[in-house]
Amino acid sequence: MPKFLDAVAGFGVTFGSMFKKPVTEEYPEKPGPVAKRYHGRHQLNRYPDGLEKCIGCELCAWACPADAIFVEGADNTESERYSPGERYGRVYQINYLRCIGCGLCIEACPTRALTMTNDYEMADDNRSDLIYGKDKLLAPLEPGMEAPPHAMAPDSTDDDYYLGNIKPAARDAR
């Protein structure tokens, strides 16, 4: 007799859920809200004048447990300056086939060059398109920014950049 009651209880659960309103998410048309601190796609940030924050130190690659990041640093020159320090990340790649979204690379970055956005739509049917280079990772240029390579802001030092004392400047004066 107890087995019969178990079956009746199961039918009761099914019968009770038949009259509930269905929950349907219309995902592609209306994406749902994302948490504020969601770990989505990575982004390489820039200083307000457009120089890259990445100094090519490779700490993010060392911190990555999935070995998904490849960084090749190079030296800045006065004629070609991409970041305010001595070095910059000449090659920067993140393999999203390997990335586990843990955020350890973000914590390891000494200049806060690498952050994670709320973008989570990265699906693709081609595996090679999921290896993002600097062209896909760099933050877009905002008004007042100049695309590198260019010189540092006038009368500024590396420390001014690291302390956040650089403002977007009109480059017309040069």
From Swiss-Prot:
Residues 143-174 are annotated as: Disordered. It comes from the Bacteria. This is NADH-quinone oxidoreductase subunit I. SUPFAM superfamilies: 4Fe-4S ferredoxins. It is found in: Cell membrane. Residues 44-74, 90-119 form the 4Fe-4S ferredoxin-type domain. The keyword RNA-binding does not apply. Belongs to the complex I 23 kDa subunit family. Coiled coil: none annotated. Its cofactor is [4Fe-4S] cluster. One of its GO terms (molecular function) is quinone binding. Keywords: 4Fe-4S, Cell membrane, Iron, Iron-sulfur, Membrane, Metal-binding, NAD, Quinone, Repeat, Translocase. [4Fe-4S] cluster 2 binds at C64, C99, C102, C105. GO terms for cellular component: plasma membrane. It catalyses: a quinone + NADH + 5 H(+)(in) = a quinol + NAD(+) + 4 H(+)(out). [4Fe-4S] cluster 1 binds at C54, C57, C60, C109. PANTHER family: NADH DEHYDROGENASE [UBIQUINONE] IRON-SULFUR PROTEIN 8, MITOCHONDRIAL (PTHR10849:SF20), NADH DEHYDROGENASE UBIQUINONE IRON-SULFUR PROTEIN 8, MITOCHONDRIAL (PTHR10849). NDH-1 shuttles electrons from NADH, via FMN and iron-sulfur (Fe-S) centers, to quinones in the respiratory chain. The immediate electron acceptor for the enzyme in this species is believed to be menaquinone. Couples the redox reaction to proton translocation (for every two electrons transferred, four hydrogen ions are translocated across the cytoplasmic membrane), and thus conserves the redox energy in a proton gradient. The gene is nuoI. HAMAP family: NDH1_NuoI (MF_01351). Its EC number is 7.1.1.-. Binds 2 [4Fe-4S] clusters per subunit. It is a peripheral membrane protein. NDH-1 is composed of 14 different subunits. Subunits NuoA, H, J, K, L, M, N constitute the membrane sector of the complex. It comes from Mycolicibacterium vanbaalenii (strain DSM 7251 / JCM 13017 / BCRC 16820 / KCTC 9966 / NRRL B-24157 / PYR-1). GO terms for biological process: aerobic respiration. InterPro entries: 4Fe4S_Fe-S-bd, 4Fe4S_Fe_S_CS, NADH_quinone_OxRdtase_chainI.
